[in-house]
Amino acid sequence: MTHNVMCDDVLPQLNLPDGVTRWNANLLEEERRLRNSDGHADRIILTINTLGKRSKEAQSLNTILTSVPRLRENRDARLYLLCHGGRGVGILKIGVKRLFVVPPSHAGLMEIEPVCVLDFFVDTSNQRQGYGKILFEHMLAFERLSPGDVAIDRPSVKFLAFLRKHYGLVEYTPQSNNFVVFHKYFERHQQQRRGVGGSGRSGYQHCNETTTQQLGTQSGLLEDINQTHPAPSYALRGVVMGHTGPPLDLTNVTQQQKPYHQPFATGRKTSYELQYERYLQSQNCRPTGNAGYGGGNGPASSAEVRATNCQARRRTSPTRSGVPYNIINGSTGS
């Protein structure tokens, strides 16, 4: 199958209310054990696997990042599934990763354990209707996170544009592991270390520090997933746990969106802004059709743009997910 052809598996009808449900391996196994007399749990599993395949093809990845077998391999991972009209619309997979990154304040490595967005996909027939924002914000609400608290595994330029438009997230330091950690993350947790405030949801420490204490926990992902959590401090509709919950009114969802606006400093453009301009130019030059998906015309990730600019210094490195990320050699040669 070529990248220009999306997975043609038909998404089954689900007995789930419109809105977001949250799943992990344990909940899926419980659903299959207790509520599968009519094949309902099997249809949920088929939906997750199908959307995972479509995500892989849409992003031109070498491997499927989201599937029920992968959730069984990483039992701390959580999957947010958005449904509308009784069918799956989008998926968002998260998990905690231990990362070694260079913060913006100094050149030394720092160890952090943030919640990471590992896969984020809205079915192509439902894009540009506000579903991605619904899915992302419901994840933030349940994980008690702000947008700048999450790290993102190899985000596309489209995802970076989404974060800038809705949350004003722009500045980040390119990392060799191709995770994007915005400067807001470090600013927030520097304040937390000084006791000024913060969510306490993501921990970090410098590699040369002797203390083993880290801020917060692993974002609650090691907690019992069925544990009762306090309600969010703001109104939230349609977020459900497993198979129960109120319906979500998705009528006129695009009209309900109000993008987050943040003033940006004028003057020299950031590296992200230059990447974003390249992405917009590629969209203008793209032939009509399924823009942004498949073949060599797809938008490059921030790491790919940076690696391409380095030409001879470019190399690939396998990762835990099997995706060959572009990273930069320290030497000037190949």
UniProtKB/Swiss-Prot annotation:
This is Alpha-tubulin N-acetyltransferase. SUPFAM superfamilies: Acyl-CoA N-acyltransferases (Nat). The record marks Q59 as: Crucial for catalytic activity. It comes from Trypanosoma brucei brucei (strain 927/4 GUTat10.1). Specifically acetylates 'Lys-40' in alpha-tubulin on the lumenal side of microtubules. Promotes microtubule destabilization and accelerates microtubule dynamics; this activity may be independent of acetylation activity. Acetylates alpha-tubulin with a slow enzymatic rate, due to a catalytic site that is not optimized for acetyl transfer. Enters the microtubule through each end and diffuses quickly throughout the lumen of microtubules. Acetyl-CoA binds at residues 120-133, 156-165. Coiled coil: none annotated. Pfam families: Acetyltransf_16 (PF05301). GO terms for molecular function: tubulin N-acetyltransferase activity. It comes from the Eukaryota. Its EC number is 2.3.1.108. Keywords: Acyltransferase, Transferase. It catalyses: L-lysyl-[alpha-tubulin] + acetyl-CoA = N(6)-acetyl-L-lysyl-[alpha-tubulin] + CoA + H(+). One of its GO terms (biological process) is regulation of microtubule cytoskeleton organization. Residues 314-334 are annotated as: Disordered. One of its GO terms (cellular component) is nuclear lumen. CDD domains: NAT_SF. Belongs to the acetyltransferase ATAT1 family. Residues 1-186 form the N-acetyltransferase domain.
